[in-house]
């Protein structure tokens, strides 16, 4: 087995004594640092490489901290409108994953880079920590590499804000494949609308 296979097996056993100790120490370190911080190399090199990372010029990795739990509805001065049924503030569940939120925050802060992918690295009772792989689309090495230069096209600007990354496609319900799965297209919202709209055509 190669080295990456051993690393993968280590991360599969997160409850082992070694990993529990390591994760606790790392989590303490992460808490002392800013919410978005650049790191020199990925914490999980096997995972990063599976998601497209290469240890070469133009690729950067940032660690992002996201607060766990539900999303409170922002209501200025507590003023809510409509019927009591729709006036909830605290018990609401955000439809997007925390991983997609981490990608969004990294993408907003680093506007000149393109978000490629992300993965989980740690969590405690308050926060989840993700590492986001970003690509410098202006770098010559990236522009000359046929495997990654697709991301240099202008259509991929802020793909994380439009649900085009892997995490984005997952919360949009577009991850699956195969027979009958095309019924979920073009989106969950469009599918719901199509199935719940009564259409009485003139000639039927």
Curated annotation (Swiss-Prot):
GO cellular component: cytosolic large ribosomal subunit
This protein's UniProt keywords: Ribonucleoprotein, Ribosomal protein
GO molecular function, one term: structural constituent of ribosome
InterPro entries referenced in this protein's UniProt entry, alphabetically: Rbsml_eL15_core_dom_sf, Ribosomal_eL15, Ribosomal_eL15_CS, Ribosomal_uL23/eL15/eS24_sf
GO biological process, one term: cytoplasmic translation
Keyword Endoplasmic reticulum: no
Signal peptide start and end residues: none
Family matches, as Pfam families: Ribosomal_L15e
Domain of life: Eukaryota
Family per record: Belongs to the eukaryotic ribosomal protein eL15 family.
PANTHER family assigned to the protein according to its UniProt record, in alphabetical order: LARGE RIBOSOMAL SUBUNIT PROTEIN EL15, RIBOSOMAL PROTEIN L15
UniProt-recorded name of the protein: Large ribosomal subunit protein eL15y
């Amino acid at each position: 087995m190669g080295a990456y296979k051993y690393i993968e097996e280590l991360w599969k056993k997160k409850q082992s004594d070694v990993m529990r100790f390591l994760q606790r120490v790392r989590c303490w370190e992460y808490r002392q640092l800013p919410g978005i911080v650049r790191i020199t190399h990925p914490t999980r090199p096997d995972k990063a490489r599976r998601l497209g990372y290469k240890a070469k010029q133009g690729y950067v990795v940032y660690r992002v901290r996201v607060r766990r739990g539900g999303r409170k509805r922002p209501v200025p001065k507590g003023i809510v409108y409509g019927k009591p049924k729709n006036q909830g503030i605290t018990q609401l569940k955000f439809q997007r994953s925390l991983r997609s939120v981490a990608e969004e925050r990294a993408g907003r802060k680093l506007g000149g880079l393109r978000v490629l992918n992300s993965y989980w690295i740690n969590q405690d009772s308050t926060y989840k920590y993700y590492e986001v792989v970003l690509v410098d689309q202006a770098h010559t090495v990236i522009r000359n590499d046929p495997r990654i230069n697709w991301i240099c096209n202008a259509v991929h600007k802020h793909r994380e804000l439009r649900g085009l990354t892997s995490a984005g496609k997952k919360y949009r319900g577009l991850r699956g494949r195969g027979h009958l799965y095309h019924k979920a297209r073009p989106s969950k919202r469009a599918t719901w609308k199509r199935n719940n709209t009564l259409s009485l055509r003139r000639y039927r």
